Amino acid sequence: FNETVPLDSILRAGRGGVLAVVLGAWCLVKIERWVRKWMPESLDIVFTPLITMILCLVPYILIIMPATGYVSTALCWVVEKLCMSDILIVRIIAGYISTALFLPMVAMGMHHGLVALYSVQLESFGYVTLYPALAMAGAGQVGAAVAIYFKAKKCGNTRLKNVITGALPAGLLGIGEPLIYGVTLPMAKPFISAGLGAGFGGAFVMAMQVAATAWGPSGLLALFVMTAGPHGVAASVGCYAVGLVICYIMGFIVTNAMVSVEDVANA
């Protein structure tokens, strides 16, 4: 226990944050299943939860919380060094790579794991720098979809035009799944080009050190949470908006170069 700085104590309340909760819940499930195997049915409803809590409590406080606390600290250190580096090129590279890879993570359902990292960063610094960059990924999809729309119009693919028309408003507001599963992912190439285009916006946002005080949808709706950062609220909101425009343009350009009219006609 650190008497001088209690918040730095290994056993302080909340140590490990979301990571500790996830791992603790996993342990609870495993132990509960084991207890339920040998517990008589007549006693199950009362004693199974009690025994499970007793068996989990001490290891959770003495092992899981401190261990995940160190992991959280390490993750925050890495994010801080990359996303908040004084070296501009480091922030640019980190922003581009993380944003370009975010769409594949969304498609595989792995992007929810980043929420834990958001929580860790918010708890430690009071703001999140990774979320504004990753929010650019959806804007790249919008640019890619617009490029495909014009090609679909040119080749007469009415079905694809209608799908894009219905999905674009949601994409502008940060809901990217209709565009992912209805347009870009089935065609493969636009899925890649959207990420490559969005990377430019992510690099810009990370370079300008845009920060958010919360997280939620991406796109235009995220403008309302870009209220932190070293340059002030107005700069964060403005730079985020510029980042969106960059993603729209670069997503359009990269997709226009990578996807042919024949690809759209056969979609």
Q: How would you label these PLM feature ranges?
A:
Residues F1-R33, A203-M208, A235:
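Early transmembrane hairpin of solute transport permeases
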